[in-house]
Amino acid sequence: MAENEKLNNVAVDNDVGTMEDVDAIMKKYDRESNTRVWEGTPRKILRVLTALFGIFLIVMNMWIKMDERARRPLFLGLVILLVFIYYPIKKGSQKVNYMPWYDIVMAAVGAFCFFFYPLNLEKIVSAGTRIQKAFVVQIGSISIPLLIVFAIIGTLILVECCRRVVGMPIICVAAVFVLYAFLGAGKDLKTVMYNLFYTTTGILGTPIGVCSTYIALFVIFGAFLEATGVANFFIDCANALVGWASGGPAKVAVVSSALCGMVSGSSVGNTVTTGSVTIPMMKKTGYPPEFAGAVEAASSTGGQIMPPIMGAAAFLMAEMVGVPYAKIIVRAILPAFLYFLGIFLGVHFKAKKLGLKGLPREELPKWKILLPQIYLILPLVVLVYMIMIGFTMATAAVYATLYCVVVAMISREEGKKKLVMAIPLIPLLFMTLMSRSFEPGTFMGENGSTLCLAIAFALLVINYAISKPNVKSLPTIIDAFENGGKNCLSVGIACGMAGIIAGVVTMTGLGQVLIGAIVGLSNGHLIIALVLTMLCCIVLGMGVPTTANYIIMATTCAPILASGMGLNLMAAHMFCFYFGIVADITPPVALAAYAGSAIAKAPPMKTAWNATRLAIAAFIIPYIFAYNNALIFVGNDVKFLSVASIVISATLGMASIASGLMGYLIRDMKWISRIALVAGGLLMVIPGTVTDLAGLAVLVVVLVLQRIENKKDKAAASV
């Protein structure tokens, strides 16, 4: 571990620059990183407030029973309050401990507009659509309906928060939808504001509901998982596993990004975090800078489709499709495997073409050092286990978070102290394994989980007090709560804005209009509808966060594919989910690729095109499961042989396409062979026995011809 940390530090220092340079890259390509500068006492206060926000989210979801119509605006009000504290009016503000008066006013007013709803819930609900007659203030002869005023102000302040944290693209999209409500559907101001602000189909709809529960808790879990040091462990394991192979550092980037992507749902964040280590290593091995940046960007973007934590959009998918999240995880396994396999094969063929070697084994981490650290993945194992046996996502996330706390404290100790700090795991493991056996109606049945949690927490506190562990442990826990709370802000704002779009679609019946338009435009052909949906997803994704992109597509295009074209509902939503993600590496606005290019010091557009070429699987796989649902374990044909045949043909197809794109199979090839391999690969990924055999024949012919050419070269060399 120490050897690899040394290697990592050298890579960052020599190629990327200082950690300040890495932060600068994050701020350039990731709006969430552009925060105010707080120092000293104000920084400590803000740190505690944000940590308390994270703690409140856990307590609210686990132990406080609250009406959904009260919980959602309360959550969004707190998010708005913190957004104005963290994010300045314009990018790059460097004033220390400074928050202008207008930000203070907007923070207070915005929070109040949303807090007013839960504080007066019964009266507002009873008023129904007659909100203009409730809470009326009379000024002379003018009657001012406060609820409409609060709705307008609250919505506008939400838009300003979105501009600061997320960006303008989603605001422009929302503005078009709102204009349609007024000008296209002929709705009046009262109707629009009532539906957008006071119902559970608009701003306070399903997206913000899922965000305030599952997404928020999993974001906090992700922050704690990072605090355990599991990301470094993943990178070390990837180095030990494939670092020695041909073009090792690129393969390390693929494997480590796939693993680290389970922890973080940000394409740009993953690219910068793991890329600061892997990109310099790839360049040092001999990969061109634009290719090195592209490998990391494509791999990090794929982290959002990697089970078990697939980014915020996956939780929304579970809610919108009405499928348990456990099934979402299972159905995403094969597509994710094929995606990363495609990238892995691409970097392999590129390494062979360039004649690149791996890293010396003596420079790589040793398994005898890594295996004792296997406990670091315990929270992930527990999370998956609890979800699979039927715990709610919220419960699984909270208990897995507590495992993270224990694991983080263990990881910072040495020798026997590790065993002492592991004692709280005993009641936690007991609860995890036995809670489903607690008999309903008994004390343990009603309170067993809470009791085990309380015992574990008490042991944790006692351990900390008696053992006097590493002084960094407690600050690390506070930092994790702070990071978790802060990471909830951008997702919350994006979900709120996407709720405006979803609200307009519901209120105006726009969804049915779009279904009719696309069905007519495609003339009933599914492939045309799929291509149009893909283009919409990619265009929207150019600047719109994955979560918001998915919500927009799930409320507009997914119903078109499902209702209008007869596509399976799960396949339709997964199709939109995939193409919303690949927008991060698709030119011209490919933020993850641009972040990778900044670290690699390569041309941004060349890096983006290389990333698109490497991630070609992401543009093919959705079409495979759209036409053959067995790939995502949906339908009546889900049998072992049918799934196995799809995986085998898709794997061979990915290999053929990757080989053709990189220009190497077992030797350099001419353009005609490259085109033939890409065409043959596409035939193999198209469902059907005839196309599979035709594609396989092309691959075999090219392989045989290359072997013949190799023999000719050897014969000529021996003469």
What is the predicted role of each segment?
Residues 112, 156, 160, 164-165, ...:
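Core transmembrane alpha-helical segments of multi-pass membrane transporters/permeases
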Residues 144-149, 201-214, 240-254, 285-291, ...:
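Membrane-interfacial loop-to-helix junctions in multi-pass transporters
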Residues 2-142, 148, 152:
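Conserved, well-structured core domains of diverse proteins
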Residues 235-303, 309-316, 322, 546-580, ...:
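Hydrophobic transmembrane alpha-helices that form the pore/transport pathway of multi-pass ion
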Residues 62-66, 86-97, 152-168, 319-326, ...:
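Membrane-water interface regions at transmembrane-helix termini and the short interhelical loops
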Residues 65-74, 96-102, 136-145, 202-210, ...:
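Interfacial loop-to-helix junctions that mark the boundaries of transmembrane helices
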Residues 163, 222-226, 257-266, 298-304, ...:
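Transmembrane alpha-helix interface/packing and boundary motifs in multi-pass membrane proteins
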Residues 2-53, 330-486, 591-682, 710-719:
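Long, contiguous bundles of hydrophobic transmembrane helices that form the permeation core
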